[in-house]
Amino acid sequence: MEILKTLWEKSSVGEWKIAQLRPLKLLPAQGYGEDYFWIANRFEFPTTHRSFSFGQLVESTGSTNSFLKQSIVPVVALVAGASFLRVIGTAFVISASGLVMTAAHVLLDPEDSGYGGAINENGAVRFDGNIQMGVLFPLPSTSYGPSAVRFAPFQSSRFWGGWKESPLFHERDRVDFDTDVAICRLLPHPGGAYQPLNLSLRPVEVSEQVFAIGYAEMDDIPVRYVDGAVVLGQFSQDLYVSVGTTTAVHLDNAQTRSVSTPGPCFEFDARIPGKMSGSPILGGDGAVIRGVVSKSLSGERHAFGALLGPATHLPLFDQESLKDLMAKGSEGVPRIQGTGL
């Protein structure tokens, strides 16, 4: 099993471009099976490129895990003054400019888990001001050590749906999603380019082999405060792969609501533990993203994914869709084209 990984850079005239394209083999670590496993830490040899900066060359060298952690990241939430950083899901980079995708319900975890609130502000969603949400990116191990990370806060978030008013006095209104997909924007990368995964506009097919990659059951991270700065304690950040086959596709679920996952979605028979919500689901033999992990049935190999293709047509921050951004090239959104992709 492998994933097709691109390495992006910004040209001297400010255009995003792919500098490298390489397959990464995903092998189980010792003691794991082939349908659910922690990724073995194979070393990936660098591919030289004359226009690379030193930092980019460092990023192009390392283990399979270090490569993937540039593109697949844990979603975290910090409540002001709390003693730990909550790990609430997984996200993945979809543009070199700093767009990341996750499951929409991950962003409402503060409301659902009772440590924060989402407020109806004239039909828009506003979160409590004492909560910071974002993702963690690895820093180059040669300069900062093997487990150093950088917190990248969400600057803005976009999901699709509206407020559903509860008829019961004791229940709060809540967001009713059109699809379980959300896109968040980060500040520009300090080193030039984020490293996105390849997207597909094609729907997944029944009986297609797919696999999700995410931070299964990752523990919350202890924090302490030094001169007003947040310092993270020791933590483990391990990526897991869960392999399955699609069993049903619900393209018209927005109208029929035949399953509880909102919007166009599909079912697949894979083990999906907690904290993998928002993980990318890959198909096309690992070349492209087909969907986003939405939910799973506890203790069973039965999960649901939100389809990526239909979500690419929805309006984003400036009313342009993800498909529009693919065509323009202004954000560095990758799309790999070919038979079956």
Show where each model-derived region lies.
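N-terminal activation segment of mature serine protease catalytic domains
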Residues: W8, S12-T90, A103, D178-A182
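Active-site region of chymotrypsin-like
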Residues: L68-F84, L187-P196, V226-K328
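Short glycine/Trp-rich loop-beta-loop segment that forms part of the substrate-binding cleft
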Residues: L26, N198-Q237
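Conserved catalytic-core segment of clan PA serine endopeptidases
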Residues: G55-F67, V79-S83, I88, G114-G192, ...
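Cytochrome P450 catalytic-core helices
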Residues: G98, T102
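Short, charged beta-turn/beta-strand-edge "cap" motif at the junction between a beta-strand
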Residues: V106-L107, A216-D219, S296
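Short, flexible surface segments
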Residues: T90, A96, P203-E208, S277-G278
